UniProtKB/Swiss-Prot annotation:
Family: Belongs to the AzlD/HI_1737/HP1330 family.
A GO cellular component annotation in the UniProt record: plasma membrane
Protein name according to UniProt: Branched-chain amino acid transport protein AzlD
One Pfam family of this chain: AzlD
Subcellular location: Cell membrane
Transmembrane segments annotated in the record for this chain: 10-30, 46-66
Disulfide bonds: none
Keywords: Amino-acid transport, Cell membrane, Membrane, Transmembrane, Transmembrane helix, Transport
Length: 110
């Protein structure tokens, strides 16, 4: 299905509007002169850990301990993330390192 030029322009305008709205809305709602509300500060503290926990559970939900590789690559990859983070305290390094360990195990070992 092809779109007419008008439909294409409307689609592009809506995407631009949506992108700009999500970028600028926080600055309009919370101007720099006012203090940030306590609930927003609270969410800023608890949401990162909650999101990471949710992602870990989502990634491990289909791991079968009774078949295939018995979840060994996932366990070793998760352990690599934990150990790298305890050692270097760098989230990007931890996630990237755990991903590399997991992919090497899945592609070359199991």
């Amino acid at each position: 299905m092809t779109m007419t030029m008008t439909q294409q322009m409307i689609t592009i305008a809506m995407v631009v509007l949506g992108t700009m709205l999500t970028r600028f809305l926080p600055f309009m709602i919370f101007p720099s002169g006012k203090p940030t509300p306590k609930y927003v500060q609270y969410l800023g503290k608890v949401l990162p850990s909650a999101v990471i926990g949710l992602l870990v559970i989502y990634c491990l939900k289909d791991v079968s301990l009774l078949s295939g590789s018995h979840g060994i690559p996932e366990l070793v990859g998760a352990a690599a993330v934990v150990l790298l983070h305890l050692w270097k305290k760098n989230m990007l390094l931890s996630i990237a390192g755990g991903t590399v360990v997991y992919m090497v195990l899945v592609q070359l070992v199991f």
